[in-house]
Amino acid sequence: MRWDLSFKRQALGDPVSEGRRVWEWIQRVRPLHPSLDLWRPTAESREEAEQSPPITQDYLLQYIHDAQTTSRYPDFSLAPAFSGQIGQGNKLDLSFNMPNPGNAGIGLMTGEALGSALDASEELADTLMHTTASIFSPNIIGGLSRSDHPIKNLNRDKPYPFFYVPGWKMFFASDSPHYQRATQLATNIAPVSNGAIFTFGTPDTYPTILNQW
């Protein structure tokens, strides 16, 4: 099954300096699963991906700098790299000044191998969430979501009050207005960084629990 990891935080510096934290995160998650070990530049073809050398910190920082320079607006996003098997790997997404000035975001769309590992191991899910929350403090909100759950129909149903993708595991900052309600609904709470990681039931039941919000 495919999973999506995403975190939104308050940036501590400019996008390039935030890139150094992204590089630290890459180094920290590499040992967690074989598909996270080798990171390559995003490519337009399979052949190009196969021929590309692994990314370096300098490559990542230059990629962010170039994206910022060529963007017409202060807010911009980019997909600089992927890890794992070509065509079935894990895609890295970054955003800056979105949705608000000073915000920064990181996302990881898992491939088949890492997705299957997350299906089988809650410990891996917890470690991935904890590592991400620790590196990107101060965080605002984050989550780990399974992609097969239906998307909420916002024309029919109200959006979640926290205005974020609902997740099996979610991070809320301790000063978040949603922290208390998360505490009431969670089946497990693990303090970390400037808040806590909340687990809502199981990968199958978390949408039902969060719909009580």
What is the predicted role of each segment?
Residues M1-E44, S145-W213:
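C-terminal interaction module
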Residues M1-S6, S95-S116:
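Glycine-rich, often proline-containing surface loops adjacent to acidic residues and nearby aromatics
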Residues S17, V22-N90:
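N-terminal low-complexity, intrinsically disordered segments
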Residues R72-L92, P166-L185:
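Generic detector of solvent-exposed, compositionally biased contiguous segments
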Residues L78-G84, M109-E112, A190, G195-G201:
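Generic recognition of long tandem-repeat/solenoid scaffolds
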Residues D93-P99, A186-I189:
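Short amphipathic beta-strand and strand-loop transition segments with alternating hydrophobic
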Residues G102-A104, S137, V192-G195:
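Short, solvent-exposed coil/turn segments at beta-strand boundaries
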Residues G107-P161:
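Short helix-loop boundary/capping segments
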